[in-house]
């Protein structure tokens, strides 16, 4: 059984027991979160596609870790002008483990 959920403006295909890195959620480590925006639920040949969401479906997950990804560095310059700038960015993420899919 698997589901496609929407969180943080992205879609993720998840199954029970999967660990997924999603955009930062406002939840503490060890707590439980529920994803209500379920787009698709499949159990073998039984597939439920939402229009746009599946009614009554939800995915429960446990927050494993809060962290930041590796640094992404951007460098801009203008030739012959002695002008340059260097920026760094680390995107925060939340690692969740899917516990239960209800449809």
UniProtKB/Swiss-Prot annotation:
PROSITE patterns on file: RIBOSOMAL_L21
Pfam families assigned to the protein according to its UniProt record, in alphabetical order: Ribosomal_L21p (PF00829)
Entry keyword RNA-binding: yes
GO molecular function: rRNA binding; structural constituent of ribosome
Keyword terms, alphabetized: Ribonucleoprotein, Ribosomal protein, RNA-binding, rRNA-binding
A cellular component term, taken from the record's GO annotations: ribosome
UniProt xrefs under InterPro entries: bL21-like (IPR028909), bL21-like_sf (IPR036164), Ribosomal_bL21 (IPR001787), Ribosomal_bL21_CS (IPR018258)
Swiss-Prot/TrEMBL GO biological process terms: translation
Family designation: Belongs to the bacterial ribosomal protein bL21 family.
Subunit annotation: Part of the 50S ribosomal subunit. Contacts protein L20.
Function statement: This protein binds to 23S rRNA in the presence of protein L20.
Protein known as: Large ribosomal subunit protein bL21
Gene behind this protein: rplU
